[in-house]
Amino acid sequence: MSREDLEARLRAIGAERYHDKHPFHHKLHGGDCTPDQVRAWVINRWAYQAAIPMKDAAFLSRCADPDIRRAWRSRIEDHDGGVDSGGGLRRWLKLAEAVGLDPDYVASGRGILPATRFAVEAYFHYVREQPLLQAVASSLTELFAPKIHENRIEGLLRHYDFADESSLSYFRKRLSEAPRDVAYGLGWVLDHADTPEKEDMACAALIFKTDVLWAQLDALWGAYVDGHVPPGAWRPGEGMA
C-alpha cells in the first residue's frame, strides 16, 4: 500500500468512527445539554485530559531515539505548561470554573464515572505497553480534532452563557497545537508501517483510540441523559464552586 493509500485508510477510520458523530456531542454543540449535563462532561473529560501528559511521558520513557523524544515532548508541555502560565490542564479548569464547578473538585478526579476511568486507563496502558507503531498510531485521532474544536467553540458560544474566550481557551489553543503534533505522528506512522501487517496494526490502533473516546461519551449518555448514574459518580449539586 502506498503512503497515500494508507493515509486515506486512516482518515476513513476517522470519517466513520471519530466521536464528533456521537449523539452527546450533537446535543452539547447544539445547545441542548442542561447545565448539569455540561458539568458532567467537564468533570469526566478531565480524566482524559489529565492522563494525556502522563501517557506521553510513559511513551517517551520507551523511546531510545532522541529525535522522537525531541518531537514528542512538546505534547507534555502543551498540557502541563509552565509554573506561571500553566497549560491545557489549567485551561480546562478555567472551563470547570466557568460552568460553576470547584476546580479543585474537578482536579481531584472524584465523581468520575467508572466506565470513563476504565477507558482512560486502557488508553494509558495501551500507549505504555504496545509497540511504538501502535502507540503513535493511537494518537492520530488528532487528525480529526481541529474540526470538532471549531464546531465546539462555535456551538458553545452560540448557545451557552458561560462560554467566552477565557472559558473556551483550551479548545482555541488546540486549534494550533493539534495539527503540529499530528503532522509528526502521521509522518512517523507512514514511514514505519511498511508492511501489510504493520498497516493493519496502525489502523487497529486508531480504531482502538476511537473506541476509547466513544466509550466515554456512551458512559456520559447513560448516566446523565438516560439518568442511570452509578454509585460514587458525580451527582448534580456536588463539587460546586
Swiss-Prot record:
One Pfam family assigned to this protein is TENA_THI-4
Task: State if Nuclease is listed as a keyword.
Answer: no
Q: Which SUPFAM superfamilies match?
A: Heme oxygenase-like
> From the Swiss-Prot or TrEMBL record, what is one GO molecular function term?
pyrroloquinoline-quinone synthase activity
Question: Matching Gene3D superfamilies, A to Z?
Answer: Heme oxygenase-like (1.20.910.10)
Which terms are listed as keywords in the entry?
Answer: Oxidoreductase, PQQ biosynthesis
Q: In which pathway does it act?
A: Cofactor biosynthesis; pyrroloquinoline quinone biosynthesis
The protein's annotated catalytic reaction(s) are: 6-(2-amino-2-carboxyethyl)-7,8-dioxo-1,2,3,4,7,8-hexahydroquinoline-2,4-dicarboxylate + 3 O2 = pyrroloquinoline quinone + 2 H2O2 + 2 H2O + H(+)
Q: What InterPro entries does the record point to?
A: Haem_Oase-like_multi-hlx (IPR016084), PqqC (IPR011845), PqqC-like (IPR039068), Thiaminase-2/PQQC (IPR004305)
Protein EC: 1.3.3.11
GO biological process terms, alphabetically, are: pyrroloquinoline quinone biosynthetic process; sulfur compound metabolic process
Tell me its family. Answer: Belongs to the PqqC family.
* Role played: Ring cyclization and eight-electron oxidation of 3a-(2-amino-2-carboxyethyl)-4,5-dioxo-4,5,6,7,8,9-hexahydroquinoline-7,9-dicarboxylic-acid to PQQ.
* Protein name (record): Pyrroloquinoline-quinone synthase
Natural source organism: Ruegeria pomeroyi (strain ATCC 700808 / DSM 15171 / DSS-3)
- Its gene name is pqqC
